[in-house]
Amino acid sequence: MKTLLLLAVIMAIGLLQVHGDLLNFRKMIKLTTGKEPATRYSFYGCYCGMSGRGTPKDATDWCCRAHDCCYKNLESRGCRTKFLKYNVTYQEDQIVCEDADDCKSQVCQCDKIAANCFAANLKTYNKKLRFYNKFRCRGAAPAC
């Protein structure tokens, strides 16, 4: 029981590190993959979850690296991505970002692209990379 509680606390901390609208991002991932994002992607590989480093381990990890880069690009243009709420709808299993505000719309697009990337790479998802030890991530981080 203590192990389960500790795991829940660790996942919550990891999820708090994510920028943007966490609840909408979770819904997007759930819609596109059918999987529970907290257990599947929060600590996957070298880039999913908090603070990525090294060389991404596989296509799913590259999705997370691209997502990080997408947010960094927005931040360099003056968008504040941390906890930025956006409006999104789902029409016929499609994600539709609806904000007129450019930063909100772009954060939504970053999340949408990542969710679709996860879905496109479900077949190569590697369970051994779940809860991967980030200290094992070596090599130079790929440029954005």
From Swiss-Prot:
Signal peptide span: 1-20
Active site: residue positions: 67, 111
Catalytic activity: a 1,2-diacyl-sn-glycero-3-phosphoethanolamine + H2O = a 1-acyl-sn-glycero-3-phosphoethanolamine + a fatty acid + H(+); 1-hexadecanoyl-2-(9Z-octadecenoyl)-sn-glycero-3-phosphoethanolamine + H2O = 1-hexadecanoyl-sn-glycero-3-phosphoethanolamine + (9Z)-octadecenoate + H(+); 1-hexadecanoyl-2-(9Z,12Z-octadecadienoyl)-sn-glycero-3-phosphoethanolamine + H2O = 1-hexadecanoyl-sn-glycero-3-phosphoethanolamine + (9Z,12Z)-octadecadienoate + H(+); 1-hexadecanoyl-2-(5Z,8Z,11Z,14Z-eicosatetraenoyl)-sn-glycero-3-phosphoethanolamine + H2O = 1-hexadecanoyl-sn-glycero-3-phosphoethanolamine + (5Z,8Z,11Z,14Z)-eicosatetraenoate + H(+)
GO cellular component, one term: extracellular region
Topology relative to the membrane: Peripheral membrane protein
Record EC number: 3.1.1.4
Cofactor notes: Binds 1 Ca(2+) ion per subunit.
Annotated S-S bridges: 46-137, 48-64, 63-117, 69-144, 70-110, 79-103, 97-108
Cofactor: Ca(2+)
Listed GO MF terms: calcium ion binding; calcium-dependent phospholipase A2 activity; phospholipid binding
Subcellular location: Secreted; Cell membrane; Mitochondrion outer membrane
UniProt xrefs under Pfam families: Phospholip_A2_1 (PF00068)
Coarse class of the protein's main subcellular location: secreted
GO terms under biological process: arachidonate secretion; defense response to Gram-positive bacterium; inflammatory response; intestinal stem cell homeostasis; killing of cells of another organism; lipid catabolic process; negative regulation of T cell proliferation; phosphatidylcholine metabolic process
Keywords from the UniProt entry: Antimicrobial, Bacteriolytic enzyme, Calcium, Cell membrane, Disulfide bond, Hydrolase, Inflammatory response, Lipid degradation, Lipid metabolism, Membrane, Metal-binding, Mitochondrion, Mitochondrion outer membrane, Phospholipid metabolism, Secreted, Signal
InterPro entries from the UniProt entry: PLipase_A2 (IPR001211), PLipase_A2_Asp_AS (IPR033112), PLipase_A2_dom (IPR016090), PLipase_A2_dom_sf (IPR036444), PLipase_A2_His_AS (IPR033113)
Binding site for Ca(2+): 47, 49, 51, 68
Family classification: Belongs to the phospholipase A2 family.
Additional free-text comment from the UniProt record: Group II phospholipase A2 is found in many cells and also extracellularly. The membrane-bound and secreted forms are identical and are encoded by a single gene.
Function per UniProt: Secretory calcium-dependent phospholipase A2 that primarily targets extracellular phospholipids with implications in host antimicrobial defense, inflammatory response and tissue regeneration. Hydrolyzes the ester bond of the fatty acyl group attached at sn-2 position of phospholipids (phospholipase A2 activity) with preference for phosphatidylethanolamines and phosphatidylglycerols over phosphatidylcholines. Contributes to lipid remodeling of cellular membranes and generation of lipid mediators involved in pathogen clearance.
Name of the protein: Phospholipase A2, membrane associated
Organism: Bos taurus (Bovine)
